[in-house]
Design a protein with these regions (language model features):
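N-terminal pre-catalytic "stem/leader" segment of glycosyltransferase-like enzymes
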Residues: 2-71, 99-291, 665-708
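Active-site and donor-binding regions of nucleotide-sugar-utilizing enzymes
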Residues: 109, 235-379
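A nucleotide-sugar donor-handling region in carbohydrate enzymes
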Residues: 191-196, 200-217, 341-420, 441-448
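Short acidic alpha-helix that forms the nucleotide-activated donor recognition element
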Residues: 292-296, 554-564
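Catalytic binding pocket for nucleotide-activated donors in carbohydrate/polymer assembly enzymes
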Residues: 511-520, 574-645
Length: 708
């Protein structure tokens, strides 16, 4: 029942649900205590509402956001509590006492301070929100960007300001209970004094040298940097916070480009969720600002997603535009008709080319280039996995990864196995004999569209956690507590060092300060990469090799899960195509029940897979391949399919990718040279046809008149 209430209220935990209930019940209790009247009861209810409200705000509760939508926002709740305190004084037969008038005057004056406080905080935030935010771009030498105000002044500023009424409320309650007018006066004085002080502390940040430069100066500095840096290849991305992984997967590839790279983002939220990189990053939310940027040296633009904002860069004719996507699969999204707006579409292997031919959505065959998948380099075949990771993966109890995709937007039952087959798959895996370990890593979008998918995910999570608890109590499975303790100590050390390195990046500032100081330290970047690799090894060794796990969040990454797994179960998505790079056995669920032959006909990536029905009855074939690799009947098919989907192993994918960039850059330059030649020829023709005694208008002629 509690879990149902948590889902309905959209809160994160039972504690959050309890705090929400206390807020809802606390205000009626305040009114009742004021009417009785009872000072102790009122004080107790006030403490409860203060603490519960603060807890919900600290958690960023969904309910708190909803209250503001029904005119019960933060300011209203504080005002109601203060009015009820005045009611308490009236009910205590103190209508003519100076403290009553003082309380009323205090709360009126206190609320009069809210307007300048809110105006100042809004003005500071707006002025510090520059038209462009960057990383790894040297703006510090070009414009002066002052330090951000102390975080304690702006972070949750409205809540902090309103909580200054605590002194007045406490003092008035002391007076109501004990008759001490001095306590009331002191509380009222502190509330008003601190409120005025808060407003005064904000004033310096809206004047003088504490104000960041205007937008025109920032944009001019960006153009000056672009002219000096001369970017040649751009990775362009626009999307929601949850889609940041789509651009993050290309960062290492951009770092390894031969051409000078630049990343252009359109949303600040993507910049905030961007993984560390050495590539210069420019976030330009405004379309007009982007279209006015000087990108004349860029010859190739790469697009990782088909979104409406792409048009703002697609309109630039001096560069060639390429769709590279964010995964290679047989989903309809992989053959989006929108792709025909690009000069070229790059696919991993021959399968991508054939996919467009079959779909017949207007993408020309000569516009398709096979470049491999350079971001798959971290995926390793089992024999290439380091020994430390193989030990952690537990060769005696092989690991099977269940990585279903999400439900999608269209309600197609074939999108994900999680609803119709997920529980069957996990039940059979946790009950397998000989045993296997299950890693369950759902797609981060799971449950965002379909409540049914969200419910299935929670049931599968509970199933995995229950099986893990049962296995931990099973004496057949032995662990090494000393080794696990050592690994956990190593994890703590690595995480502490990563925290220090993250703090050294100046993360305490705001966006403007991050733009000023956000030039990556190459040595620190290398150290972070090394530490993350060490963290991954320590993570897998920090718990028994037989322990089932639910893995969510950014770490460990999907490819890390690939490397410790002997096999995978998934759905039609780029996850399958990526896993094929490992050469390991895999199974794919036919959730739409098309039948094996039709399912394989429609989906290239499953041609070397074990095909599962929703009952998962065929799962035994996958487990047989794990236990006896030499007798695996699909091993040869997987090798052939890997080449078809992902291209040849040689030359390396990054080399193919660099060659494709260079080739397209030459085409772009040839086009631009042709345009310049035509423009020159047109100008010569105009001069040749000019009447005797006339000349063509010069750039500095104001009316186009000629001179004799």
């Amino acid at each position: 029942m509690i879990s149902t209430a948590i889902r309905v209220a959209r809160v994160g935990s039972a504690a959050e649900l309890a705090a929400a209930a206390l807020v809802m019940l606390g205000f009626p209790c305040l009114m009742l205590a004021a009417l009785v009247p009872s000072v102790p009861a009122f004080a107790a209810a006030a403490v409860v509402t203060y603490l519960a409200d603060h807890y919900l705000h600290r958690k960023g509760s969904y309910l708190i956001n909803r209250l503001s939508k029904v005119r019960a926002g933060l300011s209203i709740r504080f005002l109601i509590r203060q009015l009820l305190l005045v009611l308490l004084l009236v009910r205590l037969s103190l209508p003519g006492h100076a403290v009553l008038y003082g309380a009323i005057a205090c709360f009126i004056a206190f609320y009069s301070l809210q307007a300048p406080h809110g105006a100042l905080t809004t003005l500071i935030r707006n002025r510090r929100k520059m038209p462009v935010a960057t990383r790894n771009v040297d703006l510090k030498s070009r414009i002066r960007i002052p330090d951000a105000p102390p975080r304690r002044l702006l972070h949750r500023s409205a809540e902090k300001m309103l909580h200054l009424d605590l002194f007045a409320v406490a003092g008035i309650l002391v007076f109501a209970g004990l008759g001490s007018a001095v306590a009331a006066a002191a509380g009222i004085g502190l509330t008003l004094g601190l409120g005025c002080l808060y407003v005064l502390l904000l004033l310096p940040y809206v004047r003088g040298r504490k104000i960041p430069p205007k937008g025109e100066a920032v944009l001019s500095a960006i153009d000056d940097w672009l002219a000096a840096y001369r970017p040649e290849t751009v990775l362009y991305f626009s999307g929601s916070r949850n889609s940041a992984y789509q651009v993050n997967m290309w960062l290492q590839t951009m770092e390894r480009l031969d051409a000078r790279p630049l990343i252009i983002l359109r949303e600040r939220v993507i910049l905030n969720n961007l993984a560390p990189t050495t590539v210069p990053v420019v976030c330009v939310p405004g379309g007009v600002h982007l279209m006015n940027m000087d990108l004349s040296t860029v010859r190739v633009a790469l697009y990782a997603a088909n979104v409406g904002k792409n048009i703002h860069l697609l309109r630039v004719p001096t560069m060639k535009h390429v769709f590279i996507g964010h995964g290679d699969s047989d989903k309809l999204a992989s053959v989006n008709p929108f792709s025909k707006v690009y000069d070229e579409v790059w696919t991993a292997g021959r399968a991508g080319r054939d996919r467009y031919v079959i779909a017949d959505v207007g993408v020309r065959d000569d516009a398709i280039v096979e470049v491999g998948r350079p971001q798959l380099a971290p995926i390793q075949a089992w024999e290439d996995v380091p020994e430390a990771l193989r030990d952690a993966a537990g060769e005696g109890v092989p690991t099977v990864l269940y990585a279903p995709t999400w439900e999608g937007w269209d309600g197609n039952p074939g999108n994900t196995s999680i609803v119709l087959a997920g529980e069957n798959i996990v039940e059979k895996l946790v009950q397998a004999d000989p045993p296997v370990r299950v890693l369950y890593k759902p797609h981060p979008f799971t449950g965002t569209v379909s409540a049914e998918a969200g419910a299935a995910h929670r049931r599968i999570t509970a199933l995995v956690e229950k099986a893990a608890a049962e296995r931990a109590a099973d004496r057949r499975f032995a662990s090494d507590p000393a080794a696990q303790a050592q690994a956990k100590t190593e994890l703590d050390r690595i995480e502490a060092r990563l925290a220090v390195l993250a703090g050294a990046d100046g993360g305490k500032g705001d966006e403007a300060e991050a733009t000023r100081d956000g030039v990556v330290d190459i040595e620190r970047h290398k150290e972070v990469a090394r530490l993350r690799a060490e963290w991954n090894t320590a993570y897998w060794r920090s718990f028994p090799a037989y322990e089932h796990r639910v893995i969510t969040g950014a770490e460990p990454r999907l490819y890390d899960c690939f490397n410790v797994s002997a096999a995978m179960v998934s759905d039609i998505s780029s996850v399958v195509s990526d896993f094929i790079a490992s050469g390991k056995p895999y199974a794919v669920t036919d959730s739409a029940e098309l039948g094996v032959e039709e399912f394989k006909r429609q989906n290239t990536a499953v041609r070397a897979a074990v095909i599962l029905s929703n009952s998962a009855a065929e799962l035994g074939s996958l487990l047989d391949a794990v236990r006896a690799p030499a007798a695996d009947p699909l091993a040869g098919d997987r090798k052939e399919l890997k080449r078809y989907l992902l291209g040849p192993d040689e030359p390396k994918s990054i080399d193919q990718f660099n060659a494709a960039v260079a080739d397209l850059a030459l085409k772009s330059e040839a086009r631009n040279a042709g345009q310049r030649s035509q423009a020159g020829a047109a100008e010569d023709a105009e001069l040749a046809t000019a009447l005797p005694g006339q000349r063509s208008p010069a750039a500095d002629d104001t009316d186009g008149a000629t001179t004799p």
